[in-house]
């Protein structure tokens, strides 16, 4: 818990439609979010974390092919498009992780025999891409009015060779890391919805990273709320 307290002390405290940049007293890069950017999807959002940017579009609930129909809930699909080229193994893996997270919070039983499709376009990848994809997906689902039991966010942690924890790492920090851990958490109880890891770490380091991610999630959810409040107060 000591590691979590240290991490929490270094987190952002002022958030809004755009948050402050990373500084010696801030462990997260700056955030920015804009919703309702695209006309064709039912909901859309652009999410920026530092220089990592993802554009998300949500289609549905809509009619679904009989072959994909699920009688008691909506069929949820996630499509991730890289900045350049065709989707590969990494994109397919991230699609599965984002889909699993969305399925854990979307109230699909309210729209049986329909489809909800989340399309993610990578605009730029400067580290913590999966976390940014999760955050963009959440804000696009909110914009589309898809019913959810809670919001969710993604947080990436990196452990360097000395065991130091870095939240929201850049590409350079990821390359130098001994381990990279990404968590998806809900807004109701900071409950763990999904986790994926790469590299070597101890059980104690895993718990330290999870505690730091849970602390960081509170600030991301505050950013969500203030971003939404600013948007709807203008309309």
From Swiss-Prot:
Pfam family, one: RNase_PH
InterPro entries registered for this protein in UniProt: ExoRNase_PH_dom1 (IPR001247), ExoRNase_PH_dom2 (IPR015847), ExoRNase_PH_dom2_sf (IPR036345), PNPase/RNase_PH_dom_sf (IPR027408), Ribosomal_Su5_D2-typ_SF (IPR020568), RNase_PH (IPR050080)
UniProt keyword terms in alphabetical order: Cytoplasm, DNA-binding, Exosome, Nucleus, Phosphoprotein, rRNA processing
Region (Disordered): 1-21
GO biological process, one term: rRNA processing
Localisation per UniProt entry: Nucleus, Nucleolus; Cytoplasm; Nucleus
GO molecular function ontology, one term from the record: DNA binding
Residues with Phosphoserine modification: 20, 23
CC annotations in GO: cytoplasmic exosome (RNase complex); cytosol; euchromatin; exosome (RNase complex); nuclear exosome (RNase complex); nucleolar exosome (RNase complex); nucleolus; nucleoplasm
Compositionally biased intervals (Polar residues): 12-21
Role description: Non-catalytic component of the RNA exosome complex which has 3'->5' exoribonuclease activity and participates in a multitude of cellular RNA processing and degradation events. In the nucleus, the RNA exosome complex is involved in proper maturation of stable RNA species such as rRNA, snRNA and snoRNA, in the elimination of RNA processing by-products and non-coding 'pervasive' transcripts, such as antisense RNA species and promoter-upstream transcripts (PROMPTs), and of mRNAs with processing defects, thereby limiting or excluding their export to the cytoplasm.
Subunit structure: Homodimer. Component of the RNA exosome core complex (Exo-9), composed of EXOSC1, EXOSC2, EXOSC3, EXOSC4, EXOSC5, EXOSC6, EXOSC7, EXOSC8 and EXOSC9; within the complex interacts with EXOSC3, EXOSC8, and EXOSC9. The catalytically inactive RNA exosome core complex (Exo-9) associates with the catalytic subunit EXOSC10/RRP6. Exo-9 may associate with DIS3 to form the nucleolar exosome complex, or DIS3L to form the cytoplasmic exosome complex.
Record-stated family: Belongs to the RNase PH family.
Listed name of the protein: Exosome complex component RRP46
């Amino acid at each position: 818990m000591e590691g979590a307290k240290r991490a929490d002390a270094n987190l952002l405290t002022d958030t809004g439609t755009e948050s402050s940049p990373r500084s010696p007293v801030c462990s997260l890069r700056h955030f920015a979010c804009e919703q309702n950017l695209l006309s064709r999807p039912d909901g859309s959002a652009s999410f920026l974390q530092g220089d990592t940017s993802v554009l998300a579009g949500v289609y549905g609930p809509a009619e679904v092919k009989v072959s994909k129909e699920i009688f008691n809930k909506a069929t949820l699909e996630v499509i991730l498009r890289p900045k350049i080229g065709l989707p590969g193994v990494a994109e397919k893996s991230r699609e599965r992780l984002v889909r699993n997270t969305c399925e854990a919070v979307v109230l699909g039983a309210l729209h049986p025999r329909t489809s909800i499709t989340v399309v993610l376009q990578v605009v730029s990848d400067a580290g913590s891409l999966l976390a940014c994809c999760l955050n963009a997906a959440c804000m696009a689902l909110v914009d589309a009015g898809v019913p959810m039991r809670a919001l969710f966010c993604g947080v990436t942690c990196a452990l360097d060779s000395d065991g130091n924890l870095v939240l929201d790492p850049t590409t350079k920090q990821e390359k130098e890391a001994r381990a990279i851990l990404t968590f998806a958490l809900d807004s109701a109880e900071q409950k763990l919805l999904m986790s994926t890891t790469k590299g070597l770490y101890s059980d104690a380091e895993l718990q330290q990273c999870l505690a730091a991610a849970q602390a960081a999630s509170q600030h991301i959810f505050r950013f969500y709320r203030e971003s939404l409040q600013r948007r709807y107060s203008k309309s």
